[in-house]
Amino acid sequence: MGLNDSSGTLVAPKPKGIIDPNTGRPVGEDDPFFLEINNELADKGFLVTSTEALITWARSGSLMFMTFGLACCAVEMIHTSMPRYDSERFGVAPRASPRQSDIMIVAGTLTNKMAPALRKVYDQMPEPRYVISMGSCANGGGYYHYSYSVVRGCDRIVPVDIYVPGCPPSAEALLYGILLLQKKIRRTGTIER
């Protein structure tokens, strides 16, 4: 039916949702989540959601982390930003300033002398803020647990959301911890935090 067709009134074709240009079929037609979205798009032509769900989705997909590397775990933390693991493909990118960060990754041995600096940096982060404790030393003191100068876990100074075990944990483990944090943000939301 073209514009010059005089057979009747012009009727717009029924939308079929998001179409994959390669296959010509709806995206994720086997996935129940995408099937629900495609059906809603086909029915109404637009999506309806709550503001909190939209904010939570946007916040979990664009997290900025600040590195607080104190020891050897920091090397593995840097690996997650390198091309092999590329944390930016998951919507997580490093930032140098705590005022622009959503996540602080504490990696390494936290000493008593460094603890006030950790708390000060944490307080400079905007709400909602999250902390990932990376490695045995940050989780509970690790190898230096019985030393007089070591804090036995950074959770004594700042509230920790995700613990990544290992000495040092691999970059895959940290990436998994970041993905768990994204899942936690989607589950709990950010407004009531």
Curated annotation (Swiss-Prot):
* Subunit structure as annotated in this protein's UniProt entry: NDH-1 is composed of 14 different subunits. Subunits NuoB, C, D, E, F, and G constitute the peripheral sector of the complex.
Q: Which GO terms describe its cellular component?
A: plasma membrane; respiratory chain complex I
Which Pfam families is this protein grouped with? Answer: Oxidored_q6
HAMAP family noted in UniProt: NDH1_NuoB
Enzyme Commission number:
7.1.1.-
Task: Provide the membrane topology annotation.
Answer: Peripheral membrane protein
**Similarity field:** Belongs to the complex I 20 kDa subunit family.
UniProt entry tagged with the keyword Ribonucleoprotein: no
The cofactors it requires, by name, are: [4Fe-4S] cluster
Q: Where is this region: Disordered?
A: 1-25
Its main localization is: membrane
Which Gene Ontology terms describe the biological processes this protein takes part in?
A: aerobic respiration; electron transport coupled proton transport
UniProt-recorded name of the protein: NADH-quinone oxidoreductase subunit B
Q: Which cysteines are joined by disulfide bonds?
A: none
Write down the superkingdom of origin.
Answer: Bacteria
Q: What are the transmembrane regions?
A: none
Q: Which UniProt keywords apply?
A: 4Fe-4S, Cell inner membrane, Cell membrane, Iron, Iron-sulfur, Membrane, Metal-binding, NAD, Quinone, Translocase, Transport, Ubiquinone
Q: Which reaction(s) are listed as its catalytic activity?
A: a quinone + NADH + 5 H(+)(in) = a quinol + NAD(+) + 4 H(+)(out)
Which PROSITE patterns would you find in this protein's record? COMPLEX1_20K
Report the subcellular localization.
Cell inner membrane
